[in-house]
């Protein structure tokens, strides 16, 4: 690189890096919505397989009493409740409601709280 090209290259503005970017509730929930969608696909497949096997062998059914399996089932139910609540939020966005910054933040926190409450309701 010539000296002039190097000087021009050094004076170019740089974009902010992810380390200085403050995550917003909307971006965090968007990423989490995608992750739970993929996770639910695989977990439901495993759950159906487990239920089919438990029909033929009671040992698989006894796994449900294991503490680790219960924790996984609670995590699965939270993921399902979160994905459901955030999906409803997206349906409202599809019809044009809730696009202001304030509404996005409020509905984002409502999704988090409602999914926790629904999960607790399922397990109590």
UniProtKB/Swiss-Prot annotation:
Query: How is the cofactor bound, as the UniProt entry phrases it?
Result: The heme is bound between the two transmembrane subunits.
**Ranges in the topological domain labelled Periplasmic:** 56-67
Instruction: Give the Cytoplasmic membrane side ranges.
Output: 1-29, 89-103
Q: Which residues bind heme?
A: 83
A GO molecular-function annotation: metal ion binding
Q: Where in the cell is it found?
A: Cell inner membrane
Which Gene3D superfamilies does the entry link to? Fumarate reductase/succinate dehydrogenase, transmembrane subunit
Give the residue spans that cross the bilayer: 30-55, 68-88, 104-124
An annotated GO BP: tricarboxylic acid cycle
Q: Does the keyword Iron apply?
A: yes
Q: How does it sit in the membrane?
A: Multi-pass membrane protein
Please provide the record's keywords in A-Z order.
Cell inner membrane, Cell membrane, Electron transport, Heme, Iron, Membrane, Metal-binding, Transmembrane, Transmembrane helix, Transport, Tricarboxylic acid cycle
Pfam families reported for this sequence = Sdh_cyt
Role description: Membrane-anchoring subunit of succinate dehydrogenase (SDH).
Describe its partners and assembly state.
Part of an enzyme complex containing four subunits: a flavoprotein, an iron-sulfur protein, plus two membrane-anchoring proteins, SdhC and SdhD. The complex can form homotrimers.
What is this protein identified as? Answer: Succinate dehydrogenase cytochrome b556 subunit
| Species of the source | Rickettsia prowazekii (strain Madrid E)
The upper taxonomy is: Bacteria, Pseudomonadati, Pseudomonadota, Alphaproteobacteria, Rickettsiales
Q: Which gene encodes it?
A: sdhC
């Amino acid at each position: 690189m010539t000296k002039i090209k190097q000087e021009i290259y050094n004076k170019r503005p740089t974009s902010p890096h992810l380390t200085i970017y403050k995550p917003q509730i909307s971006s965090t929930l968007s990423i989490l919505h995608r992750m739970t969608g993929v996770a639910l696909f695989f977990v439901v497949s495993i759950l159906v397989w487990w239920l089919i096997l438990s029909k033929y062998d009671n040992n698989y059914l006894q796994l449900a009493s294991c503490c680790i399996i219960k924790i996984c089932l609670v995590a699965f139910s939270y993921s399902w409740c979160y994905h459901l609540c955030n999906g409803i939020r997206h349906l409202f966005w599809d019809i044009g409601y809730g696009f202001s910054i304030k509404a996005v933040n409020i509905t984002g926190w409502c999704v988090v709280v409602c999914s926790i409450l629904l999960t607790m309701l399922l397990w109590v």
